[in-house]
């Protein structure tokens, strides 16, 4: 991971650990609210930033959960390598965000390597008023909810072409 003084202003803003952590937290919250088969798998956190921070992936996400992941992947086969590549290239930023949010107890991880909301509740004064940040947070919730219906982590990674 690059030291902060070696990051460009754009890189520091876009991959700010607090911002990335907030995106992951919103996905975790929605996943856990909608899942019938357990909490948010830790390994799934590596897909959140690629879907939300890559313009091509972000803009191709379905509007509703009625489009299942497997159907979306079939219709967007050309994007499958992008997802795997972005997951790999954004791994360090995901790690940095998770480390921050776990250390602040905004997220917690259990013995099954599942993520849940932590014991600390941060007062969030989002006053974005339809800004891109607010839209990203809503799409993070959509993504968490959508992935909660996509099957287990092995199935999801296999569909995307990521090997564990």
Give, region by region, the residue ranges found by the protein language model:
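Short, extreme N-terminal leader segments that mark the start of a protein/domain
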Residues: 1-19, 149-164
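Generic structural signal for hydrophobic core residues of well-folded globular domains
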Residues: 27-32, 51-55, 101, 147-150, ...
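Helix-adjacent hinge/juxtasegments
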Residues: 70-93
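Minor-groove-contacting beta-hairpin "wing" of winged helix-turn-helix DNA-binding domains
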Residues: 113-119
């Amino acid at each position: 991971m690059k030291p902060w003084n070696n990051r460009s202003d754009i890189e520091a803003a876009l991959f700010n650990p607090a911002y990335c952590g907030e995106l992951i937290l919103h996905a975790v919250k929605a996943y856990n609210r909608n899942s019938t088969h357990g909490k948010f798998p830790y390994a799934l956190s590596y897909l959140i930033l690629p879907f939300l921070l890559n313009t091509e992936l972000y803009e191709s996400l379905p509007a509703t959960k009625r489009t299942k992941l497997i159907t979306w992947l079939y219709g967007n086969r050309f994007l499958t390598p992008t997802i795997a590549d972005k997951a790999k290239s954004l791994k360090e930023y995901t790690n940095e965000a998770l480390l921050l949010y776990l250390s602040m107890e905004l997220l917690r991880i259990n013995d099954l390597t599942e993520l849940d909301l932590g014991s600390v509740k941060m007062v969030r004064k989002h006053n974005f008023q339809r800004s891109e940040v607010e839209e990203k947070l809503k799409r993070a919730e959509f993504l968490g909810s959508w992935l909660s219906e996509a099957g287990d982590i092995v199935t999801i990674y296999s569909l995307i072409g990521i090997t564990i």
